[in-house]
């Protein structure tokens, strides 16, 4: 149990039986009336974002989220199997829980899996990964590094916009947060 004065970005709250992560918060002290805390909360399971206002000092129930580094093993249908690197236990994470991270997951890649009471909540990848381009249209002679971009399919099946000079078989660095091309690897 904590108060609204203790809120931090990333903290997970248990409100009405649902888990909500604090995306943003602001303490407001108006000239007239009592202080309050304006928050933006994201539902950990559904991804829904809401704005909620609390009176300052209100008690809120915090949830314990366990973050562990795990190794991605394989896809099992629409689900993904990870192995805990310390205990070697395997857990299955639903495809909806993995979300967009699936576009950048390679077997044996490490990721942080957050759980609450042994239920996987979300998967965090490193900010960038190195992937091999499996297909892209050939560039034309005279292509420059300052030119436009073209779509390229990487080994995970995701499509990334790359500069015209990138060819099939090259390894590129991709930002996992937004899928941007960062450079050659």
From Swiss-Prot:
Full protein name: Elongation factor P
Localization annotation: Cytoplasm
Source superkingdom: Bacteria
Entry-linked Gene3D superfamilies: 2.30.30.30, Nucleic acid-binding proteins
Organism of origin: Salinispora arenicola (strain CNS-205)
Chain's role: Involved in peptide bond synthesis. Stimulates efficient translation and peptide-bond synthesis on native or reconstituted 70S ribosomes in vitro. Probably functions indirectly by altering the affinity of the ribosome for aminoacyl-tRNA, thus increasing their reactivity as acceptors for peptidyl transferase.
Keywords in alphabetical order: Cytoplasm, Elongation factor, Protein biosynthesis
GO cellular component terms attached to this protein's record: cytoplasm
InterPro entries reported for this sequence: Elong-fact-P_C (IPR015365), NA-bd_OB-fold (IPR012340), Rib_uL2_dom2 (IPR014722), Transl_elong_fac_P/YeiP (IPR020599), Transl_elong_KOW-like (IPR013185), Transl_elong_P/YeiP_cen (IPR001059), Transl_elong_P/YeiP_CS (IPR013852), Transl_elongation_fac_P (IPR011768)
GO molecular-function terms, A-Z: translation elongation factor activity
PROSITE patterns, alphabetized: EFP
Record-level GO BP terms: peptide biosynthetic process
HAMAP family to which the protein is assigned, alphabetical: EF_P
Family per record: Belongs to the elongation factor P family.
Pathway info: Protein biosynthesis; polypeptide chain elongation
